Amino acid sequence: MNLNVYFKSVLEQDTAAVVLCNLEHEIIYMNPAAKTRYAKHSGGNLVGKSLLNCHNPKSNEKIEKVVEWFGKSKDNNIIYTSFNPKENMDVYMVALRDDGGNLIGYYEKHEYRNNETMKKYDFK
């Protein structure tokens, strides 16, 4: 069974921005939430562009250091990078690996600390 369509659907339905990058720091995928979040920076038009062009030199240095750390061990897969108090959100970088455990890319993971405001089982 090809699970790719299922995995893509998980990403497409996520309300948090998901931006996937390859090891050359090229943005290879943005989910709809990411396209909306980064709309003022060209949104979906960022696909194919370098993530490093979206950050300052200090941030780029940190990104490079994290990717290097991911490459040192198959066990190095997630690192906490910041807390965004404005959005009450933790930010992580997460390694992407192939079936053999080889590093193939990375993404930034957002986890919001806010309590859910949606009503339970609200079948509108």
Regions found by a protein language model. Give the residues of each.
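Sensory modules in modular signal-transduction proteins
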Residues: M1-K35
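Sensory/regulatory domains in signal-transduction proteins
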Residues: A33-Y121
